[in-house]
A protein has these predicted regions:
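Terminal targeting signals and extreme-terminal segments of soluble enzymes
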Residues: 1-73, 79-134
Length: 134
């Protein structure tokens, strides 16, 4: 599923002329929230339930440069859902050629913000995520 669409702006580029790694992370983070919303982890769910999601591991692989003016999209999929853990993959690509510029695999834990400890995902979230594993 497409979880982010945007462009590479000149101010996001470094002295070498390509998008700086800071911006890859930022765009992947925006994709996180769209992916979460698709399985029921919405802003209201997080606020009203006093829940959170914390990344515990993030691996980014850079495959090709993105330059100012490149239109990009991120496609995401869930790799695994467990009682308290979700693992997913983002692929950032140029919208024009569909060439993958970077991938980001993240493992995250569901949190109870009151106790500051991990807690199980609700059944509805687990079921929605399981339906999208692929």
């Amino acid at each position: 599923m497409v979880t982010y669409r945007g462009a590479t702006y000149p101010w996001e580029c470094d002295q070498i002329g390509h998008m700086n790694i800071t911006w890859y992370t930022s765009k992947f983070d925006q994709a996180n929230w769209n992916l979460f919303a698709a399985v029921g982890i919405t802003p209201s769910y997080l606020r009203e339930g006093n829940f959170g999601v914390a990344g515990v591991q993030q691996n980014i692989t850079y495959k090709r440069e993105l330059m100012a003016g490149d239109v990009i999209e991120v496609r995401s999929r869930i790799l695994e859902i467990r009682e308290k853990v979700i693992r997913f993959l983002h692929e950032m690509m140029t919208a024009e050629t569909q060439e993958i510029a970077a991938t980001c695999e993240i493992t995250a834990v569901h949190l109870d913000r009151r106790t500051r400890k991990s807690c199980p995902f609700p059944e509805a979230v687990r079921n929605a995520a399981e339906a999208q594993v692929g």
